[in-house]
Amino acid sequence: MNNLLIGFLAITLLGTSVLAGRSPQSRDVPTPRAMVHKDNAEADNGAGPNSSVRVTEQKSVGEVPVLISRPGVVNRNTRLVVLYHGFGPPQNPRALAEALRLQEMNAILAFVNLPMVADRMPAGGRDELLRVQKEDFVNGFFFRSISGATAELQQIVKELNATYHLDADKGIGLFGFSAGGAAALLALLESDVPITAAVIVNAPMSVMQNVENWQRTLKHQFEWDNASRKAASRYDVELQADKIAERKILPALLIVQGDADKQLGIEPARRAFEALKQRYVGRGEAERIQFEVIHGLAHNFGPGSGATGSAQASIDLEIEQKTKHWFERFLCRGSS
């Protein structure tokens, strides 16, 4: 989920690169077609022969940078999907937009910049980021980022709903990768925003799981305090499955995990899924939850992940297709 640079030692934690003083768009990540400057817009015909013209816009919602990809014509059936990148490739909104092309959906795609990273690096840059990661990985960095994203979600949805004249009361879609997946899951646990469908890729299922990975990587014992224990009690999908299953709108939830993800492994995600599935079955909604293992998928994906070749391209396409099909099935049905 992030590369921690402690002193001169590079420590890889969940496969991520967090470097202050560096452009939030990696030189290895190509800019998506029709990427434009803040508050400007431009048509994008590049999605393929079956896609309608789309517009890409860079906006700020409050202080939150949001990259928008929307249909040229927004109608009453157009849905909103909020997408969160990870701390590593795809590690910012632009990289995620390049990795996950969903242009044929009748949906406004809002790629949101997570707190603490990319264009939202804290004052003090790399030194400050390293300090908070080292001194308090949970409330200084990881949980601070995902809980901040969850707290911002309602206002983001409200403003985009008003700007594009949407009907978000029917429910939105959420996508999250890695830390962004944790942010999306925390929203399912805590946010009042109506969420109809969600896709989670390679996400830690609890604060504890991420701390254990931090300890393995740094070979250092994390020092728990009351604040970090409280954070751990707020984010544990397996133990809090009832909260998701009791939502007024039961979210159609697809959990995707790579079998080559050495940082997270498969079992925590599988256990969380089984706990959730039991509740979904109890509500007679078993078809609204699914667990998919992608063979060969390591932690990161997309341009800039370091993986190359036809096998990786096939994996990236599989993530894109699973995401598209899930949203089309449960969010955008009959919306064209």
Label each PLM-derived region with a short phrase.
Residues 27-76:
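N-terminal cap/lid segment of alpha/beta-hydrolase-fold proteins
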Residues 67-105, 111-124:
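Short, surface-exposed "cap/lid" segments of acyl-processing enzymes
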Residues 85, 175-178, 258:
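Conserved alpha/beta-hydrolase "nucleophile elbow" surrounding the catalytic nucleophile
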Residues 87, 259-261, 297-298:
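Acidic beta-to-alpha connecting loop that harbors the catalytic carboxylate
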Residues 130-164:
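Alpha/beta-hydrolase active-site loop
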Residues 155-216:
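Primarily recognizes the serine-hydrolase "nucleophile elbow" in alpha/beta-hydrolase
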Residues 208-284:
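The feature captures the conserved acid-bearing segment of alpha/beta-hydrolase catalytic domains
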Residues 279-336:
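C-terminal catalytic histidine-bearing segment of alpha/beta-hydrolase fold enzymes
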